[in-house]
Amino acid sequence: MSRTATAAGPSTSAPNDGSRTITITNVPTNEGGDDIIPEEDGPVGTLRLRAARTRTGPRVTWDEDVVDNEHAGKKKSKICCIFRPTRDFGESSSSDSDSDSSCDHDHDREEGPSGEGSSSNRPRQGPMQIHDCCDSDDDKNAYERLPSYQRKKIKAKRRAGRFSSLYESQDAHTL
């Protein structure tokens, strides 16, 4: 006795709706005997497969402060590969000893006997002088700073709030 499988729709590809019905039927064969036992015509069994239901629960939503990396419409909640260990006051870090390209003066400059600075490649002797011009208020790197278009929006909101408070105070004085 052999079995054949038939499927609703094309049998070479998966259906697009996620469900498929398979019907298995028995086909009698004559294998040498005249004793053919008649079998019922029709399906022996039906197997119906259905795709699992999709979740209808809450989905991810992004706050306004989430960064849109590279203006590509993709928002990220994490910033990769940035680690800033906590330091005690006065403790130096390896980034402090590196030269800072944002300063306009030479950190390696030492006062010579004639009062002129020399920028030779000799090792430093004594403590390094800290310059106030290099201390920035925001110690954020490029990944931690807001993109320029977001900074402009924030500044515009602040200005609008400042101007509205000025108008309100002028209206109060004129009444």
UniProtKB/Swiss-Prot annotation:
Major subcellular location class: nucleus
Biased composition (Low complexity): 1-15
Pfam families cross-referenced by the UniProt entry: PPI_Ypi1
Ranges annotated as biased composition (Polar residues): 16-29
GO cellular component terms, A-Z: nucleus
Ranges of biased composition (kind: Acidic residues): 32-42
Keywords: Nucleus
GO MF term (any one): protein phosphatase 1 binding
Described purpose of this protein according to its UniProt entry: Regulator of type 1 phosphatases which maintains protein phosphatase activity under strict control.
Family: Belongs to the YPI1 family.
Stated name of the protein: Type 1 phosphatases regulator YPI1
Organism: Coprinopsis cinerea (strain Okayama-7 / 130 / ATCC MYA-4618 / FGSC 9003) (Inky cap fungus)
